[in-house]
């Protein structure tokens, strides 16, 4: 994507935007990132030795699953501190479950900046 004269956006974000699945906030470089994004970068880096790590874009998952009547159990203990964050975390877990069970896909990766897992397949 272009922002003024600068091209921004990881390939995975551009794909999600181009399919109209969600409207991602373009990922910044580490040095240009706010604190919460730096924390995310450090968590991702600390997980480098895990067999696989999935990045999920919850807004894309909500859009792809909105008419599927997908049901899952959710415990609401400790929700008062961040309802939206807890819902996003739960749909992220469902998204990875759907992906691992062959119903989803991952997009991006050709630019070396990671992939995003989606709960349903799209055809590029």
Where are these regions (language model features)?
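Phosphate- and other anionic-substrate recognition elements at nucleic-acid/protein interfaces
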Residues: 1-124
